[in-house]
Amino acid sequence: MKESNYKYEVIVVLNPKAESKEKEKSIKQIEDKILGLDFKVENREDMGSKVLSYKIKDQEKGDFWVFTIGGNKPIKSKEFKLFLNRETNIIRYLILKI
């Protein structure tokens, strides 16, 4: 299989007060959006719940997830960021090119 030319790490902080079904739904939607952008999820890791340095959307804790994704073209960051901003259970995200 051909190796991906473009690799990114997407770090997502989910609302810790959301129910587990809602979190699973959000994670599934993130993966579906990644696949819709012609990328594949190479790795998905639950980093657990962590105390935040400062409050974000009135939350003092967050559930951290890290997705390593790869594709053969640059990610459409505007479209992906718009999706992440509209997802109600995501309180913060970071997209890094690796």
PLM regions with names:
Residues 1-62, 70-98:
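Long, contiguous binding/interaction regions
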